[in-house]
């Protein structure tokens, strides 16, 4: 394994790392932040903030759809009898 990493140029490893970091931000970090933001501010958002959030949801949809089965965004108090 050591010789394999030495055979790959340093610039190539940096490019692979940069792609990995951008992919992680696009698919994990920003979508989780959007879920958190929408959950905290859903009932108090203004028109422009909601429009901006809708645009970000459209932009980061692939990452959001990855977490959709695991997150529950129902408002508190829903389902009480």
From Swiss-Prot:
UniProt EC number: 7.1.1.-
Keywords assigned: Membrane, NAD, NADP, Plastoquinone, Quinone, Thylakoid, Translocase, Transmembrane, Transmembrane helix, Transport
Catalytic activity: a plastoquinone + NADH + (n+1) H(+)(in) = a plastoquinol + NAD(+) + n H(+)(out); a plastoquinone + NADPH + (n+1) H(+)(in) = a plastoquinol + NADP(+) + n H(+)(out)
Transmembrane domains' residue ranges: 13-33, 51-71
Subcellular location: Cellular thylakoid membrane
One Pfam family this sequence matches: NdhL
EC category: translocase
InterPro entries to which the protein is assigned, alphabetical: NADH-quinone_OxRdatse_su_L
Gene Ontology molecular functions: oxidoreductase activity, acting on NAD(P)H, quinone or similar compound as acceptor; quinone binding
A GO-annotated cellular component: plasma membrane-derived thylakoid membrane
Membrane topology classification: Multi-pass membrane protein
UniProt keyword Repeat, yes or no: no
Function: NDH-1 shuttles electrons from an unknown electron donor, via FMN and iron-sulfur (Fe-S) centers, to quinones in the respiratory and/or the photosynthetic chain. The immediate electron acceptor for the enzyme in this species is believed to be plastoquinone. Couples the redox reaction to proton translocation, and thus conserves the redox energy in a proton gradient. Cyanobacterial NDH-1 also plays a role in inorganic carbon-concentration.
Quaternary structure note: NDH-1 can be composed of about 15 different subunits; different subcomplexes with different compositions have been identified which probably have different functions.
PANTHER family membership: NAD(P)H-QUINONE OXIDOREDUCTASE SUBUNIT L, CHLOROPLASTIC (PTHR36727:SF2)
Family: Belongs to the complex I NdhL subunit family.
Name of the protein: NAD(P)H-quinone oxidoreductase subunit L
Organism: Synechococcus sp. (strain WH7803)
């Amino acid at each position: 394994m050591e010789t394999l990493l030495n055979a790959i140029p340093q610039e190539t490893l940096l490019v692979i790392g940069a792609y990995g970091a951008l992919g992680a931000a696009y698919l994990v970090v920003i979508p989780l932040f959007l879920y958190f933001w929408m959950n905290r501010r859903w009932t108090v958002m203004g028109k422009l903030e909601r429009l901006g959030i809708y645009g970000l949801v459209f932009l980061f949809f692939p990452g959001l759809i990855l977490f959709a089965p695991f997150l529950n965004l129902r408002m508190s108090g829903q389902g009480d009898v």
